[in-house]
């Protein structure tokens, strides 16, 4: 583990003064805007992962490249690698099984269900901060071991897919039968900036489980994937870790059975490494010197590798066959008396005091040791609920195998979204509830059907505001992090979404559209909801003097209630949706920051967010029908009035509540209140970046561009979950 003392500094008193004391003239050096204004709005989050950072170009099609892959040969190469021990990082017992399982586990384990961010889906373990987290010590070596294989197969396999597949092959090579593997994870080329890893400034700062439940964080300590293996705050108490384990695994959407299976399964193979104190360990990859070439944690203890390796500081081997699958974890857990001890590095762990020396040494076949366990392993024996599950798995190894296979598949695929995104020959046929399954299409509407449906919607008596609002309510649940939500499935008509306060419009509009769907029987309700938005926007554009056809791709289906996990879908309920001027809680960030958060989840750029907010305001789509931000005298017309009036210096804005959430815009001459607004409205005039964008649409020549840009951004949101079109 690295400390502040480990940070490498190339400057010293004896060096050339140019390199020592001269002004840094490099791009990006010097005091930055955020140094002066640390609360500056993070509009830059909407510019992540653009084509400018992608060396493969916007025409690269990963699914197409993957189809050219010799999948069997790749798995064969991975299997061979497992026992191809390298002298620069020798394999324990001659096998990298445990190392590759840990690499896959720690890549996927950053996922959190509360906001859908994290996970293995984009290969983020290659970048900071994850590449240098204390919990990821030595995984830099695992990735380097994979490099020759990645180099051989090139872009036919992404790093993100390769990390998880390597873990699967490791399990299979140990004799375990996995549930399957779905490829389809596309690499990105820079760190995710939108993931909130926490506010702590020091590694391994403890978080109370109750606090963890209120935040979108996946670990109980900064820099860990899950929990401190020595117990909360190094307590050494197995029972004290139970709440932390439930909190962190629960934040991933795992129940108690899945949690027990994952902990036990992950600790059936491999070992931890703690040959000596952490003071021997050098800088992490991000802080290591340039000649280290991205490798970190160089150890000065002995050879620094093999028997002398230091990773977590714990020195634990759980089972008698650490490279072969078994039920020894549970057998040892319940068979022996466990006594607290310390590793050579000083970390708290447990040893089976009454066990014979039955554990093989990883490098000396003539040596044996007693079984050892982590503090958190013993939680599975001493917590009453975990203990029941553990004993069942002890007595029924097949039940354990099945539970781990399914939990591992869920762990490694949870952030991939619907099954339609999976590719490859090992995709399981079974639909799983956490995949948000969808039925097969019942309708294939023709162009004539669509024309007739649009006419029926237009004649239904619904207003532009209602039609646009219901379509947005359906589609805007999408989360780019784990690809959940969206309009496909029409889950707006099901629990829990139909009853959300933000979706009040559904109670008025859905009965009309449901009746129309039953009468015509030509399209799914999901398609009709989106088509209603099309009709509303085309009417609003025509009223503004612009004739435009809003693109519409039919083919959505209607999910059933039994295909909808109410608890998991409840996590999609927004705290705020600035596009609809909705804010449920004032104790979570600022309104404008939550608007950025929502836009980022919808994969919108800053210009797309800007044009959508401006358009939706003049169309009157506020969730509660309020006039906040409706800066127009002609609501329902797709005009640029929002921008023109927001930037008009005739109006002076002042807050009307103590929280500074609501504002009045008064005529500077008469004092008359002309408009009301929220922070989600005024930010487009106050933030310098967003104001620059608003000015584009406020110009006299922007009307037609505004309509076209609005339609393009709108269609993007409506189709975010159309993975069937890939």
Curated annotation (Swiss-Prot):
Keywords: Heme, Hydrogen peroxide, Iron, Metal-binding, Oxidoreductase, Peroxidase. Heme b binds at residue 267. The active site is at 106 (proton acceptor). Binds 1 heme b (iron(II)-protoporphyrin IX) group per dimer. Formation of the three residue Trp-Tyr-Met cross-link is important for the catalase, but not the peroxidase activity of the enzyme. It catalyses: H2O2 + AH2 = A + 2 H2O; 2 H2O2 = O2 + 2 H2O. Pfam families: peroxidase. One of its GO terms (cellular component) is cytosol. The keyword Iron applies. Its cofactor is heme b. Residues 1-33 are annotated as: Disordered. There is a cross-link at residues 105-226 (Tryptophyl-tyrosyl-methioninium (Trp-Tyr) (with M-252)). One of its GO terms (biological process) is cellular response to hydrogen peroxide. SUPFAM superfamilies: Heme-dependent peroxidases (SSF48113). Gene3D superfamilies: 1.10.520.10, Peroxidase, domain 2. InterPro entries: Catalase_peroxidase, Haem_peroxidase, Haem_peroxidase_sf, Peroxidases_AS, Peroxidases_heam-ligand_BS. The keyword Heme applies. GO terms for molecular function: catalase activity; heme binding; metal ion binding. There is a cross-link at residues 226-252 (Tryptophyl-tyrosyl-methioninium (Tyr-Met) (with W-105)). Homodimer or homotetramer. Belongs to the peroxidase family. Peroxidase/catalase subfamily. Bifunctional enzyme with both catalase and broad-spectrum peroxidase activity. This is Catalase-peroxidase. It comes from Salmonella arizonae (strain ATCC BAA-731 / CDC346-86 / RSK2980). The gene is katG.
């Amino acid at each position: 583990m690295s400390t502040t003392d480990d940070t490498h500094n190339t400057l010293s008193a004896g060096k050339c003064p140019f390199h020592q004391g001269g002004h840094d003239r490099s791009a990006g050096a010097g005091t930055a805007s955020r140094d002066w204004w640390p609360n500056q709005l993070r509009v830059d989050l909407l510019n992540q992962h653009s084509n400018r950072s992608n060396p493969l170009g916007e025409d690269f099609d990963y699914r197409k490249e993957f189809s050219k892959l010799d999948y069997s040969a790749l798995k064969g190469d991975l299997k061979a690698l497992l026992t191809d021990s390298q002298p620069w990082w020798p394999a324990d017992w001659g096998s990298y099984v445990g190392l590759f399982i840990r690499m896959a586990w720690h890549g996927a384990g950053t996922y959190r269900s509360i906001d859908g961010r994290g996970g293995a889906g984009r290969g983020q373990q290659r970048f900071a901060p994850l590449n240098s987290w204390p919990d990821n010590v030595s995984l830099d070596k695992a990735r380097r071991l994979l490099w020759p294989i990645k180099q051989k197969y090139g872009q036919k396999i992404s790093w993100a897919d390769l990390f998880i597949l390597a873990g699967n092959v490791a399990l299979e090579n140990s004799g375990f039968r996995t549930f399957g593997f779905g490829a389809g994870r596309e690499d990105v080329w820079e760190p995710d900036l939108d993931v909130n890893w926490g506010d702590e400034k020091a590694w391994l700062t403890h978080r109370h489980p109750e606090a963890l439940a209120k935040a979108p964080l996946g670990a109980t300590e900064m820099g860990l994937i899950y929990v401190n293996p020595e117990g909360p705050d190094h307590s050494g108490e197995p029972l004290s870790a139970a709440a932390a384990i439930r909190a962190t695994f629960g934040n991933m959407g795992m129940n108690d059975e899945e949690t027990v299976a994952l902990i036990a399964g992950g600790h059936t193979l491999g070992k931890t490494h703690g040959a000596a104190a952490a003071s021997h360990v050098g800088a992490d990859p991000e802080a290591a010197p340039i000649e280290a070439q991205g490798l970190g944690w160089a150890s000065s203890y002995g050879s620094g590798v093999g028997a002398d390796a230091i990773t977590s500081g714990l020195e634990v081997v759980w089972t008698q066959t650490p490279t072969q699958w078994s039920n020894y974890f549970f057998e040892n857990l319940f068979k022996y008396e466990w006594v607290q001890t310390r590793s050579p590095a000083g970390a708290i762990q447990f040893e089976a005091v009454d066990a014979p020396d039955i554990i093989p040494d990883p490098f000396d076949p003539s040596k044996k040791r007693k079984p050892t366990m982590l503090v958190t392993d013993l939680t599975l024996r001493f917590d009453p609920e975990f203990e029941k599950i553990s004993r069942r798995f002890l007595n029924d190894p097949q039940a354990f195998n099945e539970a781990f296979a399914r939990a591992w598949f869920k762990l490694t695929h949870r952030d991939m979204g619907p099954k339609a995104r999976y590719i490859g020959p090992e995709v399981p046929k079974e639909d799983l509830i956490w995949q948000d399954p969808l039925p097969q299409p019942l309708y294939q509407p023709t162009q004539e059907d669509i024309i007739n449906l649009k006419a029926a919607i237009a004649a239904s008596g619904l207003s532009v505001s209602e039609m646009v609002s219901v379509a947005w309510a359906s589609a805007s649940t999408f989360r780019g992090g784990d690809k959940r939500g969206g309009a496909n499935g029409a889950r707006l008509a099901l629990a829990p979404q139909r009853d959300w306060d933000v979706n009040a419009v559904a109670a008025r509009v859905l009965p009309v559209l449901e009746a129309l769907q039953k009468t015509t029987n030509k399209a799914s309700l999901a398609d009709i909801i989106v088509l209603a938005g099309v009709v509303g926007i085309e009417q609003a554009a025509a009223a503004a003097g612009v004739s435009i056809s809003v693109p519409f791709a039919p083919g959505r289906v209607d999910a059933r209630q039994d295909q909808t996990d109410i608890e998991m879908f409840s996590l999609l309920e927004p705290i705020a949706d600035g596009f609809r001027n909705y804010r449920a809680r004032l104790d979570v960030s600022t309104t404008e920051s939550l608007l950025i958060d929502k836009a980022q989840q919808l994969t919108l750029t800053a210009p797309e967010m800007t044009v959508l907010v401006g358009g939706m305001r003049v169309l009157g789509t506020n969730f509660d029908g309020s006039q906040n931000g409706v800066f127009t005298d002609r609501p329902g017309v797709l005009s640029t009035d929002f921008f023109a009036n927001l930037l008009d210096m005739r109006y002076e804005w002042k807050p009307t509540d103590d929280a500074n959430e609501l504002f009045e815009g008064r005529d500077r001459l008469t004092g008359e209140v002309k408009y009301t607004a929220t922070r989600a409205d005024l930010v487009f005039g106050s933030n310098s970046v967003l104001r620059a964008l608003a000015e584009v649409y406020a110009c006299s020549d922007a009307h037609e561009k505004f309509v076209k840009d609005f339609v393009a951004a709108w269609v993007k949101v409506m189709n975010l979950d159309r993975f069937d079109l890939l």
